């Protein structure tokens, strides 16, 4: 029994978040910012909190924060090396001023 509980505890502590891609990107952002529109600290997201998201498989971020005037999350740790499209990503995201 102890061994089973230990294995379960290790599994839960090392569980990874759901992968983001173009297929679920828009829905993930919408869901997260519905509960935490300023900082993206959506603890209920299957992807974790927005500043920690693994966006390495996202290709198109066009318009992601468009018209989200209060958005100001720190997304400086995102790996956007595979993103090709960022048109109007921060259009009218007036409060966004992170480095």
Residue locations for each model-derived region?
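Sec-dependent N-terminal signal peptides
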Residues: 4-13
